[in-house]
């Protein structure tokens, strides 16, 4: 039965309030308006950022449908949409690409000004929602909201991919691209260099893969879960360190082991202390640190300017510096086995098991859970 132009009733995991489990609900998804795309979600990953919203580390309005790392099929399109058509396989983009703002026109940034990461409206461009539940509008997350069987996104926030792409390609929508790109695009790791990756979760593992792909000769994985060390070594880390094993700051240990510090550090843990350790673990004259983790909005880096004055640099990175137009190439590379994302998948669940996925994430078990719809 054709559903284009009609409301769709489907299942979704709704976060009614912070610090509470998600609730599996029946919601209504309105048809896409002009320059919008309605997508049938096939699979979605569970990212630490989703958990950070629930913990109020990332500000959001409630009730909200979380999720931003997915793959799906276009169900219908609104007026004026030319980039995709019904039936196309796509990845929603939490960092859109309008093509006309300063960031989109620059080769130095991928942070499109039409993103909803800063505005925090939780609404579409016309300031309304496409989701309703129990008679109430439900907010979206960064313009994507993938913990639902159907979602609506702007046409600038969708990447068409190979129709044969496996469901695991959903991880290119955030986790893999974020870590991998931080190494190859943002840090610009060079052949023969030394690297340290702080935080051995999905993003950290992807950063290790990126460092290895860029030709780093030494990659130090840093984490407190020793059960993650074998996977880190398998992916390219040359050694792993647990800060709890030392009676001195881990940056001092790393500097002692690397003749004054590594060339590049990537921070994926989201803790102020870890960010400072990452920065101080780099060589004073030229070290580059990339911060990916999200700390509490009430916390600030206690930064001594002297750490930067000598030549270090501190950078941030979102979605690994990739623009939306590059996502299809990443999927193609994955299908050609030039890159691999399968190592991220530790558990496959269904939408009604979503709270179990969050429990696994919070406990540090596994790497990444994906939900198959």
Swiss-Prot record:
It comes from Pelophylax perezi. This is NADP-dependent alcohol dehydrogenase. Zn(2+) 1 binds at residues 47, 68, 174. It comes from the Eukaryota. Keywords: Acetylation, Metal-binding, NADP, Oxidoreductase, Zinc. GO terms for molecular function: alcohol dehydrogenase (NADP+) activity; all-trans-retinol dehydrogenase (NAD+) activity; zinc ion binding. Belongs to the zinc-containing alcohol dehydrogenase family. Class-IV subfamily. GO terms for cellular component: cytosol. GO terms for biological process: retinoic acid metabolic process; retinol metabolic process. Homodimer. It catalyses: a primary alcohol + NADP(+) = an aldehyde + NADPH + H(+). Its cofactor is Zn(2+). The modification N-acetylcysteine is found at residue 2. Zn(2+) 2 binds at residues 98, 101, 104, 112. It is an enzyme of class 1 (oxidoreductase). Its EC number is 1.1.1.2. The keyword Lipid metabolism does not apply. The lineage of its organism: Eukaryota, Metazoa, Chordata, Craniata, Vertebrata. InterPro entries: ADH-like_C, ADH-like_N, ADH_Zn_CS, GroES-like_sf, NAD(P)-bd_dom_sf.
């Amino acid at each position: 039965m054709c559903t284009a132009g009609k409301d769709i009733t489907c299942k979704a995991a709704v976060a009614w309030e912070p610090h509470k489990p998600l609730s599996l609900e029946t919601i209504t998804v309105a048809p896409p308006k002009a320059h919008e795309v309605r997508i049938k979600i096939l699979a979605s990953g569970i990212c630490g950022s989703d958990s950070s919203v629930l913990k109020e580390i990332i500000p959001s309005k409630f009730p909200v449908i979380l999720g931003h790392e997915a793959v799906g099929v276009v169900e219908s399109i609104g007026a004026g949409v030319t980039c995709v058509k019904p039936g196309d396989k796509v990845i929603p983009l939490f960092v859109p690409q309008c093509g006309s703002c300063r960031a989109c026109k620059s080769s130095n940034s991928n942070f499109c000004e039409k993103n909803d990461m800063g505005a925090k409206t939780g609404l579409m461009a016309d300031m309304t929602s496409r989701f309703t539940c129990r008679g109430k509008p439900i907010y979206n997350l960064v313009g994507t909201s993938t913990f639902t069987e159907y979602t609506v996104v702007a046409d600038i926030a969708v990447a068409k991919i190979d129709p044969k792409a496996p469901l695991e390609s959903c991880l290119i929508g955030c986790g893999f691209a974020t870590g991998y790109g931080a190494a190859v695009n943002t840090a610009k790791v060079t052949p023969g260099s030394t690297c340290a990756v702080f935080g051995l979760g999905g993003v950290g593992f992807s950063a290790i893969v990126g460092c290895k792909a860029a030709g780093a000769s030494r990659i130090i994985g840093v984490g407190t879960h020793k059960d993650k060390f074998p996977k880190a070594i398998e992916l390219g880390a040359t050694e792993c360190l647990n800060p709890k094993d030392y009676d001195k700051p881990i940056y001092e240990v790393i500097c002692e082991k690397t003749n004054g510090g590594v060339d590049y550090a990537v921070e994926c843990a989201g803790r102020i202390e870890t960010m400072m350790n990452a920065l101080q673990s780099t060589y004073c004259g030229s070290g580059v640190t990339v911060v990916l983790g999200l700390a509490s909005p009430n916390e600030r880096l206690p930064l001594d300017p002297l750490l930067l004055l000598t030549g270090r640099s501190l950078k941030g990175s979102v979605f690994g510096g990739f623009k939306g137009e590059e996502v299809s190439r990443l999927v193609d590379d994955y299908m050609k086995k030039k890159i691999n994302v399968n190592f991220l998948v530790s558990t496959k669940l269904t939408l009604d098991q979503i709270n179990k996925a969050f429990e696994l994430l919070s406990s540090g078990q596994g790497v990444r859970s994906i939900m198959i719809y």
